[in-house]
């Protein structure tokens, strides 16, 4: 299973680790993914998704249905 957010599509970022002597080596910055069961009010059921903590924070603010609508996601297929 790839480390990708089910709702936002966030994935790993390629970055550099810089030492004290400024030697740069490649580093993979993974997304902070969490496995969560979210209640979908319109569908009257739980949805099991793998989401980033940033997405969870946005869902708490806006709501699951409005976030999915803004991202163009059909929750009945998740």
From Swiss-Prot:
This is Large ribosomal subunit protein bL28. Keywords: Ribonucleoprotein, Ribosomal protein. The lineage of its organism: Bacteria, Bacillati, Cyanobacteriota, Cyanophyceae, Synechococcales. One of its GO terms (cellular component) is ribosome. One of its GO terms (molecular function) is structural constituent of ribosome. The gene is rpmB. NCBIfam families: L28. GO terms for biological process: translation. Belongs to the bacterial ribosomal protein bL28 family. It comes from the Bacteria. SUPFAM superfamilies: L28p-like. Coiled coil: none annotated.
